[in-house]
Amino acid sequence: MSAEKRLLQEYRSILKEQRQKGSASTLSSNGILDLKPVSEDNFYKWTAKLKGPTDTGYQDAFWELQIDIPSNYPTQPPKFTFIVSDDIPRNRRQRQTNQIQDDDEFEGAEKEVLRHCYRMPHPNIAFNTGEICLDILQAKWTPAWTLSSALTAIVLLLNDPEPLSPLDIDMANLMKINDLKAYNSLIEYYVGRYSIEEEVYILN
C-alpha cells in the first residue's frame, strides 16, 4: 500500500470516529483533540492537538504538534514535533474548532476552555525546538503504528517520562533525584507562562 493510500485510509477512519454521535470518542479519551492534514491536497504534513493528562501539571492545557510524513510511510516513521513559540497572543481569547467548521455540524460536541501552551516542559522533549525522543518514533517503529496510536503514545510519555534519554537535562535531573515537587512545580510554571486560554471543542 502506498503512503498516500495508507494516509487516506487513516484520515477516513479519523473522520468517521469524529462524526460518531452518542458515543465516547476514542481519540478524545486518549487526549487527542484534533488530527488532520494541513491540506487535503498534501497528506504528508499533518497537525494535531493534544490535551494534557489529568492529575498532572499538564492538565487543563493543550499543545499543537506538526507531523511530517516521509514518502515511504508507514515503513519509516513520521516526525512529530511540538510547535513552540515565544509569540503568545495574550490580549485575546481565540477559538479553535478541531475539525468543526460549523457549530451545528457536530451535535454532542462540547466547548471547553483550556490553556493553549506554546512550550512543552518534559525530560524527553526539547524545550526550545519541540523535538521528541520516543523509541516507537525511531528504532521501535513498525508499520502497525498509526498517526493516532503514535499520538496516544506521546500522551502516555507525558505521564511516564524516561529520564535516561533526555532532551531537557534540567527536567530529567529532577526526575533522577526524585524531586517530584520541584518537577511538577516547574511544569506548572512553564505552562502558566507560555499559554493563553482558548475555547476548544471536545467530541464525546
From Swiss-Prot:
PROSITE patterns: UBC_1 (PS00183), UBC_2 (PS50127). It is a peripheral membrane protein. Its main location: membrane. Its EC number is 2.3.2.23. InterPro entries: Ub_conjugating_enzyme (IPR050113), UBQ-conjugat_E2_core (IPR000608), UBQ-conjugating_AS (IPR023313), UBQ-conjugating_enzyme/RWD (IPR016135). It catalyses: S-ubiquitinyl-[E1 ubiquitin-activating enzyme]-L-cysteine + [E2 ubiquitin-conjugating enzyme]-L-cysteine = [E1 ubiquitin-activating enzyme]-L-cysteine + S-ubiquitinyl-[E2 ubiquitin-conjugating enzyme]-L-cysteine. GO terms for biological process: peroxisome organization; protein ubiquitination. Belongs to the ubiquitin-conjugating enzyme family. This is E2 ubiquitin-conjugating enzyme PEX4. It comes from Komagataella pastoris.
